[in-house]
């Protein structure tokens, strides 16, 4: 959800065109106070890391959301002037055959203060989505739908029966604002992100 429904909406490719739910939101509250998120292209040997982006700008750790406040977009040189926003070292492309655009590198929520067990015990009724599958996102609205490949019901603070065929439907901006607990168990996944500038390696991570 972070990668697809939230941070794609922070890429200048969408923001500069006014096609993002996060347009004109810098310095504003876009998430719960406990939410902190970064895009860090400097992590040593990480799958999505780069020394410099494809415009020659050094990579950096960009703080996207700090204590719920939107701090930065992901911005390439071309869109920097349009948006009056600093360049963030986020211009990427698969190869010389593609035009560069603003893209993610290693994107993740920072750890919170709650344990996995504390989060489960505090949930009277809910869904533990252990593994997500395919879906779709509208970056202009933040609305998404994702298949739950592996999921379980949470009932009275306990994980109970498995769930088959579940789909999560919602809005990235609403999800961010309603996060009330974040785990201390950050876990990252590796993949290839496709866009108009081709496929590039990225990492996405989040705690429970």
Where are these predicted regions, by residue range?
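N-terminal small-residue-enriched
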Residues: 1-208
């Amino acid at each position: 959800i972070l990668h697809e429904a939230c941070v794609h909406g922070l890429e200048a490719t969408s923001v500069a065109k006014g096609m993002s739910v996060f347009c004109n939101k810098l310095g504003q509250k876009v998430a719960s106070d406990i939410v902190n998120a970064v895009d860090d292209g400097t992590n040593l040997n990480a799958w999505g890391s780069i020394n410099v982006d494809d415009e020659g700008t050094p990579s950096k750790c960009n703080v996207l959301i700090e204590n719920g406040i939107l701090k930065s977009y992901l911005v390439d040189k071309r869109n920097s002037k349009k948006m009056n926003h600093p360049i963030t070292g986020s211009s990427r492309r698969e190869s010389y055959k593609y035009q560069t655009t603003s893209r993610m590198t290693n994107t993740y929520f920072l750890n919170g203060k709650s344990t996995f067990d504390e989060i489960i015990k505090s949930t009277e009724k809910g869904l533990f989505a252990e593994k997500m599958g395919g879906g779709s996102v509208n970056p202009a609205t933040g609305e998404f739908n994702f298949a739950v490949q592996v999921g379980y019901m949470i009932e009275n603070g306990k994980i109970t029966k498995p769930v088959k065929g579940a789909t999560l439907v919602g809005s990235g901006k609403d999800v961010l604002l309603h996060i009330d607990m974040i785990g201390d168990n950050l876990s990252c996944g590796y993949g290839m992100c496709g866009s108009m500038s081709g496929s590039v390696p990225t990492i996405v991570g989040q705690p429970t």
